[in-house]
Design a protein with these regions (language model features):
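Structural signal for interior beta-strand "rungs" in well-ordered beta-sheet cores
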Residues: 1-91
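Long, leucine- and charge-enriched amphipathic alpha-helices
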Residues: 89-124
Length: 124
């Protein structure tokens, strides 16, 4: 069945926020307008969920986490800090290609750095 949603002391929830069933929100957390929290999510204390952000069902967020506006959180986060996601609107096919490339961007940069070092040594 549906369980209770538990809001800790000092929680601030803005207008047009959707909070599903069986959600726990820790003390002194703020959730900005148009955000959505999925069922069974656990939000820690002293967190900030930005406007139009989405926390997927069953995701757990540690204490002291900031989710910037319009971000989608699809996995649990155990380390305090600021997290962002999202891209600007574009045609769907282009967006799909760019997201795939973006996910490999760090690997590309490490490879490029390694190749630059190899080229520098070859020209010495």
């Amino acid at each position: 069945g549906l369980g209770d949603t538990d809001l800790g002391k000092g929680v601030h929830i803005d207008k047009l926020v959707q909070v599903a069933h069986d959600v726990t929100v820790g003390a002194n957390t703020a959730i900005a307008g148009c955000a959505a929290i999925g069922a069974y999510a656990r939000i820690g204390s002293h967190c900030i969920i930005g406007g139009a952000a989405c926390v997927a069902a069953e995701v757990h967020l540690a204490d002291d986490i900031v989710i910037t506006g319009m971000s989608t959180v699809n996995k649990s986060l155990s380390k305090a800090g600021v997290y962002s996601s999202g891209t600007m609107v574009s045609e769907h096919q282009r967006w799909r290609r760019n997201v795939a490339r973006f996910c490999r961007l760090d690997d590309y940069m490490m490879r490029l750095t390694r190749l630059e070092k190899e080229c520098s040594k070859a020209h010495e």
